[in-house]
């Protein structure tokens, strides 16, 4: 008999969003589950054998039915900061043994196998947070990340890995920014695409979430987001489109919020017209937990499964079918979509390998490698880093989390790690007994300052914990900021390591010589950060979102924009999100999108652009190719992320961002080594959404192609007409 938490279930959400490219030999897909496919035929045959009551019983989750409110959700997640088990509940669709239909079990997963149907929660590999994965700018790392997610999903007896989230970081204050891939739709699409490949290549279903524009936690159950069509198409939908067209993603999760007055789970335009119609999605759509608000409107609007309960798709749906408000053929199609995916992934096969032991050591090592690639060196005056082991005899390590790994953010993505390596443990692993360590939690500032004065090196670690269920101020506490300033004044060799889930204000930036953004590195936290500090790993991470100097510099800087007035949030900034806004308004960010330093230097030479494909190629067809030589001009090996931006012709009638990301390539180079780097530019990147024709249209005129190491650090400029 299953036991589960009896605390009133104010159901959290199950985040999910995923994208993919069809490139793994064993990469499973769901978009071929049509009537003509084997899986589709089997699904249709199965549904033909079911009674109406059996059909309806399969259209909702097994949790008790209940309503949710914004206030109750906020309270739940506040309490869950201390006790994540409060988020546990049934996360499955029950089996029908007489028809040999297995239970479909779901698990949260942006940072690894998180909260699921098992109680107590299973331990799993605590991967670096997805925002850290985005900071790698490495599609191979994204695929490996997905392989760990997918394999552990199967090993822990689940079918559906609810990951990754692909909502754009419109506001850095968003409580779930750490679960997704930053502020740019192109970077988000590419990282998510390969993440899906990894998940589905291991036999688990991936989920594209949260469809669409789930960009804030404040009033998330009811907020109405007013978004113009061009902005929706160019900023908030591209990653989902790629999930369907390239990734053949198994499922899509509908979001909590309304878009232009209509809840996502009953939004016929989003779910039927765009997702299933225009994009040809053949998988199934299910609601985020508690995101269903109607029976008939949702059934006709494209929602195939209500989770986690049957508040609207239980008895109410049965009544609606019997009364003729919803045709039985409509619910047949709902089931066929989900069963076809289950057949495609082999979940009706009794011989499919399910359940087993997680290889903790091997997966932990892979998690560490990904996290090491994600670390961003933001500042490094006078080459303070890497630390030279032979020159250091005393260390002062200061911070209230130095004895605890930053394994992840809060909410339904919470992972119970198989093990953790603390920051202080990681440093001791590198330096051993040859260095004397003094530690302080920083609460006694005078003690911390005295300690720092005596040390050869002072390291201050600041954590800013963010969680689903509430938005956050992107500031450290006054006590934390004061601590940094006083320690830095006491020791000119002070290194600050910040661990955040988003960008953050840094009022003391001019007073510290070295700064590292480590995000939430996962279970290997201590080893990851230490390996960067001592130079065993050369930092190569790049920011997936801009760091502002002050809050008023952000794109959504009015109450009408965020969090909204009277539950309405107006996206009046349009397409000018993140660095697009900073560039358009000539605002200098503290650190620009794409920024990240290295312990070596790189030189860009001999750029060349050539035309490929046709004038009006399909969205992902290569239209241009840019090539250039990149040389490591330093004396240590390193990796550079070469970034390609486009400046499209802009007019008053059709404003364009000053630059937008259209390609990138991570390249590893030995000292003195040169490699010819080739970056494709897709046809979609040369296009805009034409609101008159309701279609993508190629821009006319001269295009500037800029290649550099960040959106503000350009090393090569080409023109193309």
Task: Map each language-model feature to its residues.
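Conserved glycine-rich phosphate/nucleotide-binding loop
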Residues: 714
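Glycoside hydrolase catalytic-domain context in secreted enzymes
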Residues: 20-689, 695-697, 702-711, 719
